């Protein structure tokens, strides 16, 4: 039976291993096939490069989303070096953190098997994929870093909120609010979705 304790223990060990293995395979299979620098992703290199040179967002550079992702990438360029590899390395970390939190969240609301299946689907369909001629829609070289950072911070807000419901602790609630505040500095539509879900969760919070 899938619900037996022994099977659950096996899945708890195998689940993360399978997701990581699929991620590594997809990374190798898609290696350096991600960006199209002449379209949207070119802006994602140009804006932080100019910020690292002293330009000011919204004053010297036109930009339509929040400042978080671009200033993070500008710091990366300033302290690590201006290169595509610097951004890709940061995006690998963003992707890894996002997958870990998604796996934990889905395991809490569903099952370990469901979390593993969702993690595999995410790695195959979204993390590295290219379904259009323009290779902008992946997490390695996204069309807009505010989208990937928005996903990370919104999921982090819900992750810490879930930990607060399970274990209590004002620090977890504060972490959830901080991540939501950071999400506000990414993309408006992602923030609105995260805030709506957070409000509903707090309204439905069971008494402790």
Show which residues each predicted segment covers.
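Perimembrane helix-loop-helix junctions
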Residues: 2-5, 193-208
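Transmembrane-helix motifs of polytopic, lipid-linked glycan transferases
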Residues: 89-118, 123-128, 156-160
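Membrane-interface alpha helices of multi-pass inner-membrane proteins
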Residues: 172-188, 194-199
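Membrane-interface transmembrane helices that cradle and orient dolichyl/undecaprenyl
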Residues: 149-175, 202-207
């Amino acid at each position: 039976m899938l619900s037996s304790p022994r099977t659950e223990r096996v899945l708890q060990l195998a689940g993360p291993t399978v997701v990581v293995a699929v991620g590594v395979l997809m990374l190798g299979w898609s290696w350096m096939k991600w960006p199209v620098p002449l379209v949207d992703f070119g802006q994602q290199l140009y804006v932080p490069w100019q910020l690292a040179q002293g330009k000011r967002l919204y004053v010297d550079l036109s930009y339509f989303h929040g400042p978080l992702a671009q200033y993070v990438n500008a710091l990366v360029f300033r302290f690590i070096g201006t290169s595509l590899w610097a951004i890709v390395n940061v995006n690998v970390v963003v992707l890894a953190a996002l997958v870990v939190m998604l796996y934990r969240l889905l395991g809490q609301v569903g099952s370990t098997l469901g979390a593993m299946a969702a993690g595999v689907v995410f790695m195959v369909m979204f993390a590295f994929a290219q379904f259009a001629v323009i290779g902008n829609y992946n997490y390695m070289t996204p069309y807009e870093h505010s989208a990937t950072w928005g996903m990370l911070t919104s999921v982090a807000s819900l992750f810490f909120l879930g930990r607060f419901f399970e274990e209590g602790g004002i620090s977890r609630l504060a972490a959830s609010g901080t991540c939501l505040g950071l999400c506000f500095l990414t993309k408006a539509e992602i923030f609105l979705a995260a805030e709506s879900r957070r409000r509903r969760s707090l309204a439905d919070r069971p008494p402790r």
